[in-house]
A protein has these predicted regions:
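Bacterial N-terminal signal peptides that target proteins for export
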Residues: 1-9
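Aromatic- and glycine-enriched glycan-recognition loops and surfaces
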Residues: 176, 180
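A conserved hydrophobic secondary-structure block that centers on an alpha-helix together
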Residues: 169-173, 189-192, 204, 215, ...
């Protein structure tokens, strides 16, 4: 019996320490109490044995270059310059301005449109493969005519062809050539440890209703070249896209994901409870979506998609950078009943209900931001914003230029309505394709509207205020809980409410932090979904008023000079929070939202630089923010 006990001790010690030692043969007393104490003594170095992500990497999963048909009608900056720009090099924009990021990005996905992939450079260069078609010859002659009106009309015709049932110019060879040239370029600029060039493309379906997805490959050119971009000419049905991705994974053994964007412009079509054909959603379709769409792009140039004030009337921060008048191209007006199926927070709530009904939650997604820039330049900083496309690059009057023209003028989008947003933040173990992709798969990500603030969010059952005293909150977070994107494990022992550890540090180039909030969504016993926003930690000595709301942090922005003072707010915030309204029988999700103090919007910088006066309806200040991926609780 004595020998058995000692053997167990040896096994436990060997399992918990890198030091391997055993008892001497025939000597039952070889392991002493001091030996055991030494084995269980904490390492001297607090970093020894650490294998969790310690760095957040910032990038753009949604950038278009001259290779995209719509971008290429105006943009003359190619994919190579897009990679160079993201890596921190200076490039020349289409309009002739020099451009450079304040800091390099860590990763980039050039997601040019699958539809007629690579057509525009081939068309403009007079590629024989393209000019051999009647449409190609007609477009080439028009674009080279020197007649501005004819060129513009042809450009609009080309852009409109993206929504057709068949490509006006069909050349599989041309698409294949453009695709393999791109994947080779991505491999060239991919530099493990310094810069990650993920390979991807955009599937662009349903015209003005924006059911678009960015498809991202985990592997290199050898993997990606086993296919060509799947386009809306192959199918306009996102369910067919998921089946294509499933077949690709089956045939190659590789991994791929899809990120939908701009649900805010889908007019109620993005996050529905029906199939594409309008039938009740099935478990099979829900499982396909959950498998491939683990992330959603919630903020970008074409508006913010986290929440809407009509859906969240008690949320004073829900009205951020709204594009909510119509669908993408202004051909259908927005109706209030459409909003429920467009915004991320509401979709997360819908997912709770579908999870109970189907046994699969198709809307169990994490969050990222990206730009959707069509200039080949990933610019999301307010003072360095080059616009949606090359027709609205910086110049004195771009604030009033048309970005998207609609049949009804009241739905036309003007330059000032663009949001200088956003970026994807990824907690990965290293800056490589594999590590970045794997972090996206596990949803350990957050969205920012541009600033590169550092945000941590953990959920568990035992976090307390002592955990905020460490300068290594992640060590506590991973030990006692799960990170953003995770699922709360079952509580052990006494019934208790979940607790959360949240921390944020400001971007040194941006404003101080106003507050950190936790957004909770849950489904009650009557299967009704609900939400509530809790202020968890904030700057200054503010106290909640009778309505439970904190007073505003203040505003130091000098609009005339496009400056602000970091004399309010905090450079960092950290806190713990325990859900005061928890019911263990109710499924729920929680995510953190970090709000900055007011700072100048890009329009204020523009007015100052060019000495122009903009109309009174143009906003001049902004409160930048970050949204983490949720943490889910399932009874």
């Amino acid at each position: 019996m004595k020998r058995t006990v000692q053997t167990v001790v040896v096994l436990i010690v060997c399992a918990l320490t890198p030091v391997a030692w055993t008892a001497e043969p025939g000597n039952d007393e070889a392991i002493t109490k001091s030996d055991v104490a030494r084995a269980f003594k904490p390492e001297f170095s607090p970093y020894a044995g650490r294998n969790y992500p310690t760095r957040v990497f910032f990038g753009d999963t949604h950038l278009h270059t001259a290779i995209s048909v719509d971008a290429g009608t105006l943009n003359r900056v190619g994919q190579e310059d897009a990679f160079r720009f993201a890596r921190g090099e200076e490039v020349t924009a289409t309009g002739g301005l020099r451009a450079k990021l304040s800091r390099p990005l860590d990763f980039l996905v050039i997601s040019d449109h699958a539809e007629m992939y690579g057509l525009m450079p081939q068309l403009l260069s007079g590629d024989p493969e393209v000019l051999a078609t009647a449409t190609g010859k007609k477009w080439y002659e028009a674009l080279k005519s020197g007649n501005h009106d004819r060129i513009f009309a042809t450009a609009m015709e080309i852009v409109g062809s993206l929504s057709g049932d068949a490509p006006p110019i069909k050349s599989e060879k041309a698409v294949r050539n453009a695709w393999t040239a791109y994947t080779a370029l991505a491999d060239k600029y991919n530099e493990p440890g310094r810069f990650t060039a993920l390979i991807g493309f955009e599937w662009t379906a349903i015209g003005g209703f924006n059911l678009h997805r960015n498809v991202i490959f985990r592997g290199d050119a050898r993997v990606a070249n086993r296919t060509v971009p799947y386009s809306q000419y192959d199918s306009k049905n996102p369910e067919d896209l998921w089946r294509y991705l499933a077949e690709f994974e089956k045939q190659t053994g590789a991994e791929v994901l899809a990120i939908p964007h701009n649900g805010n412009l889908s007019n109620g079509r993005m996050f529905t409870v029906e199939t594409f054909a309008g039938k009740p959603l099935t478990k099979e379709i829900a499982a396909l979506r959950a498998r491939f769409e683990r992330l959603v792009e919630v903020t970008q140039i074409k508006g913010d998609g986290e929440a809407h004030p009509m859906l969240s009337p008690n949320d004073e921060f829900a009205g951020y950078e709204l594009w909510d008048k119509s669908n993408l191209n202004g051909t259908e007006a927005k109706k209030p009943e459409m909003l429920q199926w467009e915004y991320a927070r509401e979709a997360l709530k819908t997912g709770l209900a579908l999870g109970k009904k189907l046994g699969v939650n198709p809307y169990k997604f994490g969050m990222v931001g990206s730009t959707d820039s069509h200039t080949s330049m990933s610019t999301a900083e307010e003072d360095n914003f080059f616009g949606k496309h090359s027709g609205v690059e910086p110049e004195p009057h771009r604030w009033e230029h048309v970005v998207i023209e609609a049949p009804d003028p009241k739905f036309t989008i003007k330059g000032w309505q663009q949001a200088a947003s956003g970026y994807a933040a990824v907690w990965a173990t290293e800056n490589t394709r594999e590590a970045i992709f794997d972090a996206m798969q596990r949803k350990e990500t957050y969205a920012t509207t541009g600033p590169r603030m550092t945000v941590r969010f953990f959920g568990g059952w035992d976090f307390n205020n002592d955990d905020t005293l460490s300068r290594l909150p992640a060590s506590v977070g991973y030990t006692k809980g799960v990170p953003m994107g995770g699922d709360l494990p079952a509580a052990s022992g006494v019934k208790k409410a979940p607790s959360f550890l949240v921390a944020a540090m400001k971007d040194p180039y941006s404003g101080n932090l106003d507050r950190i909030q936790i957004v909770k969504g849950w489904m009650d016993k009557n299967d009704k979904t609900n939400e509530k926003v809790y202020d968890v930690v904030w700057s200054g000595g503010r106290k909640a008023g009778p309505n439970g709301k904190l007073p505003a942090v203040g505003n130091t922005v000098d609009v005339k000079n496009a400056t602000w003072e970091n004399s309010i707010g905090s450079p960092e915030l950290i806190g713990t929070w325990t859900d005061p309204d928890f019911d263990p029988a109710q499924p729920a999700f929680y995510y953190a939202r970090v709000i900055e103090i007011p700072t100048p919007r890009w329009t204020a910088y523009e007015a100052k630089r060019f000495g122009v006066t903009m109309s009174a309806d143009v906003p001049m200040t902004t409160q930048e923010r970050a949204y983490t991926s949720p943490i889910w609780y399932t009874p």
